[in-house]
Each structure stands twice: as structure tokens, then as C-alpha cells.
């Protein structure tokens, strides 16, 4: 099996691979349940998500954010990104690995890279959330030292009780 590498996407092709993975992530979330599909459509309607994807490199640009891309050989198999919520606080977003690479450590490697870069950038804590059906992701975050916490941003009533929130002190 080719080596798994975590890179910082820099070329247009690498950034396009991140965008494609984010679209796959959106589709994956929508496939979890009818309720999840409603939430994704509510919070990330297609036009809004397309605009977000067009600005992804800028909205996660250093020194206030960054993107990581998981590569298996020459194939893009996962991504994750960070942006600053406030001085000292980073938020991890859109951690996703493809179906074919789940279980080989790609998610773990992505998270390790994201956490290490947050430390290097002197963030004091990392915040993140995930949907309750994503049990494997929850196990991963807890195994890495994140702890459960309450919401760190206002939660729309439609999403109350459907998300779990995590925090790691660095």
C-alpha cells in the first residue's frame, strides 16, 4: 500500500482536491439520515456551500488558519482545516476521509497534523463539533485528548441535541 502523507495544499490542483473532498463530506453528512440531510440543507444550502468552497483557501489562510490534505500515493483521500475563532482559540472544521480509507489511520494522521500545527501557532485551545451519528469520529477525538463540552457558539434550535462539542487545551 502506498504511503499516507499529510500535506499543506498549495497548488490549484491540491486546493481543488480539498474542495472536492468537502463536497463529498457534505454528501456523506446528507446520507446519514433524513434529519441530517435537512440540517445540512438548512445550514449549508448548495449555493452557500459553493461560495464557501470558493473562499476556502482565503478563509483558512495563515496565520489565522490552515488546511491539510491526506494523500495516499497520488490520491487525495482526506482533509481537515482550522480557523481562528478568537485570540487563542482555534476551531477544527471538515475533517473527512473517503470511505475507502476509513480505518487505515488517515483521520488520526490528519488530526495529529492539525493539532500539531495549532500548537506551533500558539493557540491555547481547540474547539470542534460533530454530528451525533459520527461515532467513530467521536471516539477518535476523545482518544486524542479532546473532552466533551457544551456549545461554544449559538446553536440554532433545529440543531439542538444533534451535535456534540469538543475542546482540547493545548
Residue ranges and their predicted role:
Residues 104, 108, 112:
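Residues forming the Rossmann-fold NAD(P)(H) cofactor-binding site
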Residues 103, 116-120, 147:
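Conserved amphipathic alpha-helical interaction elements at protein-protein interfaces in regulatory
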Residues 2-5, 10, 124-127, 131-170:
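C-terminal "cap" of GNAT-fold acetyltransferases
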Residues 98-100, 104, 132:
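Active-site acidic-Proline motif in GNAT/NAT acetyltransferases
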Residues 88, 104, 120-124:
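Short coil/turn segments at alpha/beta junctions that flank glycine-rich nucleotide-binding fingerprints
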Residues 9-93, 98-99, 111-113, 117, ...:
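Acetyl-CoA-dependent GNAT
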Residues 12-15, 104, 135:
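Loop/helix-junction capping segments adjacent to catalytic residues or to phosphate/diphosphate-binding pockets
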